[in-house]
Amino acid sequence: MKPLNVIFAGTPDFAARHLQALIESQHKVIAVYTQPDRPAGRGKKLQSSPVKALALENDIPVLQPKSLRDETAQQELTALNADIMVVVAYGLILPKVVLDTPRLGCINVHGSILPRWRGAAPIQRALWAGDAETGVTIMQMDIGLDTGDMLLKTQLKIEDTDTSATLYEKLADQGPSALVEALAGIAADTLPAEKQDESLANYAEKLSKEEAQIDWSKSAEALWREIRAFNPWPVSHYQHAGNTIKVWQSHVSEKTSTAAAGTVISADKNGIDVATGNGVLTITSMQLPGKKPLSVADILNSRADWFTAGTQLNNAMGDQG
């Protein structure tokens, strides 16, 4: 197998892990594209992306155009004469002229088993929907949103204990090896491309903070999935006495209740049992305003009065509950 000359385009830590795998592979990373440095922290100093930092550590040239629609940026890309471009969480749109520039085009690492969950938040949406599995798809990029031909897919069982944070870590481990395997197949011309079945496609829209407001009229099962999907961002929450209370961990209780949805049934060190539209949800970890996430046992030591049996956990600003 002849090694490929690769351009890598990516920005966050998830992308940097894939770049590391490419650096360690037999292929040659000839240039890295990443988003422009952004002001960060209290001092608002310009901060490099994790991908840029890794590239510089390995003496790989870094390019940071504000847009790839710019003709000068496109000429720079063409001059690199790359075999292929690998795109992982880059954050800039690649116009068709860019997709067509490398000899073998551009490939992308996507955090779902396509065509299910195209779009920005595949990990969170899979959890929220109650999917049994997820995975990584390596695909040939076209001008659509995650619509290109599939080159390689991996599978990962979603565990009851998984949150978006844990699934992210698992897929960040799975993706790099899948990418290197796919590149080997591309270099040897042994990797067949599979068209996506449009009838099975759906979209994973970016999460919003509004979606994370807890609606106690939903079932305990739905809320349990939601809380896991919104961990670590934007975190499921409700309002109580004008305070936003975040819920980090929960499970579906075997208890039953005829109380109105959002009513506290009982509270002890093992959890706070809340009636829902169907079933009982046990909350085990929460976060009070200005505090860090704590176990319910710790929270009840200081705020047991907020969670006495019969308390209504309302979700409207200003409700006194």
Swiss-Prot record:
Pfam families in UniProt: Formyl_trans_C, Formyl_trans_N
Keyword ATP-binding applies: no
Binding site for (6S)-5,6,7,8-tetrahydrofolate: S112, I113, L114, P115
Catalytic activity, EC: 2.1.2.9
Record carries keyword rRNA-binding: no
Example GO molecular function: methionyl-tRNA formyltransferase activity
Keywords recorded for this protein, A-Z: Protein biosynthesis, Transferase
GO cellular component, one term: cytosol
Catalytic reaction(s) noted: L-methionyl-tRNA(fMet) + (6R)-10-formyltetrahydrofolate = N-formyl-L-methionyl-tRNA(fMet) + (6S)-5,6,7,8-tetrahydrofolate + H(+)
Described purpose of this protein according to its UniProt entry: Attaches a formyl group to the free amino group of methionyl-tRNA(fMet). The formyl group appears to play a dual role in the initiator identity of N-formylmethionyl-tRNA by promoting its recognition by IF2 and preventing the misappropriation of this tRNA by the elongation apparatus.
Similarity annotation: Belongs to the Fmt family.
HAMAP family: Formyl_trans
Family annotation (PANTHER family): METHIONYL-TRNA FORMYLTRANSFERASE, METHIONYL-TRNA FORMYLTRANSFERASE, MITOCHONDRIAL
Name this protein carries in UniProt: Methionyl-tRNA formyltransferase
